[in-house]
Amino acid sequence: MTAENATLLEPVLGKDEIGWMFVQEYYTYLNKEPNRLHCFYTKKSTLIHGDEGESISLCHGQQEIHNKILDLDFQNCKVLISNVDSLASSNGGIVIQVLGEMSNKGKLSRKFAQTFFLAEQPNGYFVLNDIFRFLREDVEEEEESPDAVEKEKKDVASEPYVNGVQSQEHLPSAKEEGHYQDPAATENNFATAALISNETDSLNQATLAVPEEPVIQVTEASVPSFVSQQENQLQDEALTSNSKNADAIGASDANVATAPKSWADLIARNHPDVKSQASVSSTASTTGQTVKGVNADQTQQPTAPYTQSNELLETSVFVKNIPPETSDVSLKSAMSIFGPVKAIEFARRKGTAYVDFVNHECVQLALNKKTLQINNATLNIEERRRLFSGKFNKSGDKKSNDNYNGMKRNFRKGNRGAFDGRSKEVTTSKKQNN
């Protein structure tokens, strides 16, 4: 096979793949050989390096860029890349934008944005333009005012409840339109809390009258609601046949005390779209079965918002900038100053970990502290962000499910100082064909 035919068979790498290879090679030199980082530039290159909003001077030429890199004093600089975008530009050039976090000399990591323009040269590419900026991290989240929270508490506390269900005086007749929840759906705590809150809001907006027909009050275990007029013929028959039992139940409502506002009720107000689903046949059977066991169940069944609210609170935090020589035992011991530690998931290669405490109070103490000193290094403690479902992924997965969203891809090592835009597989293919 001639050299011309071999050249035609060589695959041409895309601009995005060349960009990936460059980014991997550039930050590898930044970590291991920062004194040779100027080899990526030429006398035509320009560089800007500073903080967001800072007025800085332009570095022109390879020598000025080299002096600037020496002034930055990179030592054991670690970079966590979260995003890389590459686009083809004019004259065969490539524009690359990098987002991530950088930690130098073991200090706290800072978010940054860096943009490269790779220009073509006979043997590959070189960095013609380089813009680097550290980003500010002073964005404040809006919090709900204490007055609004206190007002919501008073509104909910004024509603009469019996084991999480409104008393007979505040219940509409069985023929009013509403929603019904299947008893099997009580396993979903959010759905239960949202259902109670939605019914409360709708009742406050409507003018209610004492129903002429007996109204059957039931416990949280069966979670009743109201069926539309077109679907409740079977329920009307059950209500009529059990009127005596309902009268006895209604007499006991005089002694009902108001229930305090719960955390789950607050959550329910923020989820107005949560609705229950059930069939008409299950409505009839639930109503008939609930009448007989109301008095006994009222003293035995606790309300769902009280029994399940603590399970919804976060009990773990995300810790980064952990020195690789730190052991699991020493990390657990250091984090124990905030409270008992249940488990630790330590990604030693990334220098990050998830620390799971026994309760939410320990998490609050850790987040308020924000930093922790260990092995002459400052650990950064952040809130665990659950962007995807599932547990902490092992290293090597394509995506992470929580605080990780870095690029995890294998790169092929390029030439020092320039990139030829070709993979090693091309050389192997040529040898086999020859």
Swiss-Prot record:
Ranges of residues in domain NTF2: 18-134
GO terms, molecular function: mRNA binding
Residue ranges annotated for the RRM domain, each copy included: 315-386
Compositional bias of kind Basic and acidic residues: 148-157, 419-428
Region (Disordered): 141-180, 274-308, 390-434
Superkingdom, natural source: Eukaryota
Residue ranges that the Swiss-Prot or TrEMBL entry lists as coiled coil: none
Residue ranges, compositional bias (Polar residues): 296-308
Phosphoserine carried by residues: 145
Keyword annotations from UniProtKB, A to Z: mRNA transport, Phosphoprotein, RNA-binding, Transport
Keyword RNA-binding recorded: yes
InterPro entries membership: NTF2-like_dom_sf (IPR032710), NTF2_dom (IPR002075), Nuclear_transport_factor_2_euk (IPR018222), Nucleotide-bd_a/b_plait_sf (IPR012677), Ras_GTPase_bind_prot (IPR039539), RBD_domain_sf (IPR035979), RRM_dom (IPR000504)
GO BP: mRNA transport; stress granule assembly
GO cellular component: cytoplasmic stress granule; cytosol; Ubp3-Bre5 deubiquitination complex
Ranges of biased composition (kind: Low complexity): 276-291
Function: Probable scaffold protein that may be involved in mRNA transport.
UniProt name for this protein: Putative G3BP-like protein
Encoding gene, per UniProt annotation: nxt3
